[in-house]
Amino acid sequence: VRFRAPVAVALAATLLTGCAQSVDPIERLGKKAAQRVRPHGPAPEQPYRHWGLTAPLAPAPKPSPGPPARSAGPGLPPVVDHIRTRDRVVFLTYDHEASARRDPNFTDMVRELRLPVTEFGTAQGRRPVAGLPYDAQRTEICGHLARPRPRLLRPPDGTYDTTTRRAAADCGISALVLWRASTTTGTLTYARGAHRLTPGDIVRITPTDTTVRLLRGIQERGLTVGRLEDYL
């Protein structure tokens, strides 16, 4: 079993936090010179159209998390599949087996649409740690976490027990992240609650080629994509 940090797959954190925009050569010519310059060729296609969306994704609001997730016991990290918030956002998460970072189309889409997604780097072929003794679980979790240590953990297959939470807490984990909705069958399925996307839902996406279809559904519900780390 190998655990790695959840990473914001915006192909560098600058895409999530904002970076200095490039200066177009026409801007450097000055206003009068720029008026004499006419761009050549057709206008570039808007990224959202290139990826099959009819409108750009709405920008995520300034995060306003609700009450913190409740822990099942003192010192134990909470297990979350939904964030309590009034913000109309959902959270897109990917496991390692989705090959999100190995799919060039996926990484291009994330970069061009500036999607704040989270990948949990749990290695393929891993077995659940639930049921193992404390020392074994702690070794698996602490021993294989990437540096710097992550705050969030997705246990293999989403299975865990109280020992998993104790071991995770001792490894510096602040929350175990599951999902309320998933696309593992190619369509959205729900672990509990309403059979529709609702604000605060955490979505597990695999395979990655279902992302665009999901984004259309998110827009139809009047939602957008938020950054999970801003709410946990």
Predicted regions and their residues:
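N-terminal export and membrane-targeting signals
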Residues: 1-11
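C-terminal motif of bacterial Sec signal peptides marking the signal peptidase cleavage site
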Residues: 15-18
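Bacterial signal peptide processing site
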Residues: 20-22
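Post-signal peptide N-terminal segment of mature Sec-exported envelope proteins
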Residues: 29-55
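Active-site beta->alpha N-cap acidic-glycine motif
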Residues: 49-136, 232
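Acidic (Asp/Glu)-rich catalytic clusters
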Residues: 106-113, 123-124, 130, 168-170, ...
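CE4/NodB-like, metal-dependent polysaccharide N-deacetylase domain
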Residues: 109-116, 134-161, 195-204
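His/Asp/Glu-enriched short active-site or ligand-binding loop at hydrolase and phosphoryl-transfer sites
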Residues: 159-196, 223-232
